[in-house]
Amino acid sequence: MSVRLHTSAPNKPRKQRARRVLSVVAALAVLGGGLAVGGSLAYGAQGRAGHRDAVIEGAKDLVREDGFPAVLAAVGGRDGRVRDYTVGTGDLETGAAVPVNGRVRAGSNTKAFTSAVVLQLVGEGTVDLDEPIETYLPGLVRGDGIDGSRITVRNLLQHTSGLPDYTQSLPPNPFEIRDTYYNPREMLDLALAEKAVFEPGAKWQYSNTNYLLAGLLVEKVTGRPFGEEITNRIIRPLGLKDTYWPNAGERDIRGTHPKGYGASTPGSPLEDITRLDPSQAWAAGQLVTTPRDLNHFFSALLGGEVLDAAELKEMTTTVPAAEGSPTPGTEYGLGLFRTPLSCGVDLWGHGGSIHGYETFGGVTDDGRAATVAVTALSSAVAADLDGILEAHQHVQDLVDTAICN
């Protein structure tokens, strides 16, 4: 087994964003051979072998024990230096190595980007968090127990709307819909055909429909395509060179990337599902990115480079979100999870699951960052609910190891 180490210098300090200038089970449902290990160690090998080995061993367990084809990770220290890790096989057919910091589908990490765009509009005075979505999308949000005049923008971003999740109405076999293009209104109709789950504001429950509506809100108030807004407001100003919004109908992943794998039913043989129409996720999960870019984004976001102070405070004001989360004490803000780690610090980030890829990560208040990506869903490598939850927890555990050890 080979281990590659190289050093990455810290990024130069970034300028603060001036106003307008830079202008879990439900989530998982969405969206044995040789083992190769690669890593880039930004701190250098001397004196940090324990940290390096802990991350590598945890990543190896994800491949050997949980059955993920590959693991990619980026771990950043307080001084800005970064370690990159790769374990497993990037292409099960050819045996190709896992590319360092390869592109993956971001899944629900997209929600943090989407929320940031909405909160920029709040800062500009064009959107009010406590205004009903009916104000911006009149007559659109209607159904059995569903009334857009009672659901606020905050409810959407916070997952307290009570709206049913449209992904629960999609075919469960990903290979049936891998080439299907869904427009946002079509997916919204799937959700609105179901009964409201609870009264707005009564509780927290994750629903991708909330962020579908957030994307439609952005388009309505800006008059521009959502992908254009997320690119011009977030991706380009932050210099996220490996992150992009796929074009309509774009199914292949651009650039260097490991292949992603899916299963027609939980635990059945893995098949290549890299080529996928991501429209089924849209503003809730369509982005393509890398572990490094996700660390960069969350560091910039929590560092005040994306939002002004008032909007960042709103984003990081949380409610309990233990339901559906394997980690006790987890809370949710506006597009951000706050997850307590074993070393007593909180991780601010998100995570994402979309056919072929699963990610988890974020940043701490003291400047540490870590993102782990695997090239299959937990629901693809495990055959039952307990196994799915266990595999997903192991991905989260590796982030904890990377931050805390």
Features from the language model and the residues they span:
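Catalytic loop of the DD-peptidase/beta-lactamase superfamily, centered on the K-T-G motif
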Residues: 2-5, 32-85, 275-405
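Short active-site loop at a secondary-structure junction
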Residues: 66-69, 93-156, 198-207, 282
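Short linear capping/connector segments at secondary-structure termini
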Residues: 76, 89-91, 132-140, 170-175, ...
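N-terminal, post-signal-peptide region of Sec/Tat-exported proteins
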Residues: 79-97
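Short, surface-exposed loop or secondary-structure junction motifs
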Residues: 145-347
